[in-house]
Amino acid sequence: MKFTLSILALLAIAFLVGCSAKDTRDNKLSNSEITKLGKKYGGVYVFNKKYYEEIQQSERKRKEAIKELKGRDLGGGLYAVDTKSVDQKFPQTLSNGKKYYTTYIDYERASKKILPNISSFYEDKIKRITGEEAYKYASVLPLYLYIDDNDEPVYISMSVSYSYKTKKYGFFGDEGRGFSLSRDEIRYTKGGNKFYIEDLEKQ
């Protein structure tokens, strides 16, 4: 009986330690410091304002045109839409004649190729804003891009976000997977900023 009560007491203590207890073993910075970096530097980094605005305008037109199409009702407000007519009327093409992609996933799906790692050319431009130390904690993902004549990616914009790991305490799991008193969770801070690199470099 005493053993059972001891176990229950330990479970209660583990639960009451807090659902948001921090785990900073992998970080030199605290979670609150990483959150501050996310709010300050997280967001969209635009390398080519002209092409970025072209894509923004084109995608707005495409979105409105797709809304007007009546596709097969999939239920739940979803429809299967054939976008061929939209692609013909509003092709995803820049003024330089190159096809653009709105995410790296779109490119990899269409080309069946994996994009190379982001080059130092783009990393250095981001670091001029974030600084070397803050960049170490950043998660950088390509957004708008096109492929040049040398089959190299030219990035128009990228997403920069910050994340940290927390340990949540409680009683988790099931009979199949087993039970545990804690689990790791990832929290993201995207910031919502927009940095136009060309404009900043002119200052």
Q: Where are the regions that the model predicts?
A:
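Sec-dependent bacterial lipoprotein signal peptides
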Residues: 1-19
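Alpha-helical context
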Residues: 14, 58, 121-122
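N-terminal export/targeting and maturation segments
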Residues: 18-94, 98
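Extracytoplasmic electrostatic interaction patches
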Residues: 75-203
